[in-house]
Amino acid sequence: MVKLKKSLFLVLFLGLVSLSICEEEKREEENEEVQEDDDQSEEKRGFLDIVKHVGKAAGKAALNAVTEMVNQGEQ
């Protein structure tokens, strides 16, 4: 009976350790995926900021060109 209890405790302990290790690896993988998603969204935001600034600069340049043409036409 004592051998059976020891064997049962050993099996339960090893199973618990194995489960704990699997859960830890799963959490690490999820954290890596979240971090990769964050990095990708930061890259997208950076790209969109650049496009926005280029668009503003192009719009200002076009507005200045039109304004100059109108001013030259009035003279």
Swiss-Prot record:
- Can you list the GO cellular component terms from the UniProt entry? extracellular region
> In the record, which positions carry Glutamine amide?
Q72
Q: Which InterPro entries match?
A: Dermaseptin_dom (IPR022731), Frog_antimicrobial_propeptide (IPR004275), FSAP (IPR016322)
> Where does it live in the cell?
Secreted
Q: Which family does it belong to?
A: Belongs to the frog skin active peptide (FSAP) family. Cruzioseptin subfamily.
* Protein name in UniProt: Cruzioseptin-11
| UniProt signal peptide | 1-22
Q: Does the keyword Chloroplast apply?
A: no
Region of interest (Disordered), ranges: 25-44
Q: Which UniProt keywords apply?
A: Amidation, Amphibian defense peptide, Antibiotic, Antimicrobial, Cleavage on pair of basic residues, Fungicide, Secreted, Signal
- The organism's superkingdom is given as Eukaryota
Which residues form the propeptide in this entry? 23-43, 74-75
Biased amino acid composition, Acidic residues: 30-41
Pfam families per UniProt = DD_K, FSAP_sig_propep
Please give the coiled-coil regions recorded for this protein.
none
Could you say which tissues express the protein in this record? Expressed by the skin glands.
